[in-house]
Swiss-Prot record:
Keyword Metal-binding on entry: yes
Binding site for Mn(2+): H262, D294, D296
Pfam families per the UniProt record, alphabetical: RhaA
Subunit structure: Homotetramer.
Pathway: Carbohydrate degradation; L-rhamnose degradation; glycerone phosphate from L-rhamnose: step 1/3
Name of the featured protein: L-rhamnose isomerase
Keyword Manganese in annotation: yes
Encoding gene per record: rhaA
Reactions catalysed according to its record: L-rhamnopyranose = L-rhamnulose
UniProt cofactor(s): Mn(2+)
Amino acid sequence: MTTQLEQAWELAKQRFAAVGIDVEEALRQLDRLPVSMHCWQGDDVAGFENPEGSLTGGIQATGNYPGKARSASELRADLEQALSLIPGPKRLNLHAIYLESDTPVSRDQIKPEHFKNWVEWAKANQLGLDFNPSCFSHPLSADGFTLAHADDNIRQFWIDHCKASRRVSAYFGEQLGTPSVMNIWVPDGMKDITVDRLAPRQRLLEALDEVISEKLNPAHHIDAVESKLFGIGAESYTVGSNEFYMGYATSRQTALCLDAGHFHPTEVISDKISAAMLYVPRLLLHVSRPVRWDSDHVVLLDDETQAIASEIVRHNLFDRVHIGLDFFDASINRIAAWVIGTRNMKKALLRALLEPTGQLRQLEASGDYTARLALLEEQKSLPWQAVWEMYCQRHDTPAGSQWLESVRAYEKEILSKRS
């Protein structure tokens, strides 16, 4: 430990103690909050089923920065590099298209064995795994419908894919001793004015009921469902809207996924957390950064990221909210994107843990909104960075921007050699 870091740490402890905050306790609490990193930042959502195929489903990864992962071994190596630069507990979020098999596997036939390498790798790296069926980038999703498809056979294919995915998810949880959160998102919708908005939603409702009909151990697997406002090519109508999934999660008591980019640009998911928690047992968060639309830019340490973290901490939702990330920027170094976004999420959680929430609640309850605002603003200037640097030190990760040197070295040695 450097003398400078130690001095800053001691001063920070004193400053926070003066407002009633135990920084050691804050760091212990931070270690209770894993962040689930998404594997698809590493290869622009290509996967291993058909890596040269087009990305569909109304989503886009823009940019052509060199060095993207082309295989499972490359993706895992890149992930290890990123993980080594991020302090504290982490998980990995996989999509079904990241299966490994020597022969082609139909999506409705995926099995735990196709993800065995991921499980062994997760064990070696002390990670939990989360999962997602991949209802996009496939010939049977080409017309924009999957679980809500009017064709019985196509709809059944996607139902079977999601059912198979649940068994993979349960396998993750059983093998790793921590439940896998499996999120169902489908791109189903229409580009232009839609006359019958009810029938597709009725089909989606019935399909989802069939998907979750198999009873699985909740210690191994958690179901989540995710809404969206619109996607490219589905601007006018999305079957799985916010109202649809809020009703579904409430009535079926599944987890509800809130994606920061899946709402109108004037809406924020931080304001939805406390409302949804009154009705659903769990929330899954996809923390992202929408720029004018669901662009999935790298997460910043901005007001909304901080507000999301503060909602989790202020209401003690540690055991009911699962924090995941969802962004994919192909215009910058992909490992750096992981590191920047994940570290920012963790910084926001730390800052929330360093807030004198009890004092602020008292001021609010007494109607002293002047003092509430004053303290909230003064809080921003307290030396949280020194606490963050100590946290990084204890987890053997770079405290400041030194991590970029490691990324550049890896880029020169490994990424630059990829065609």
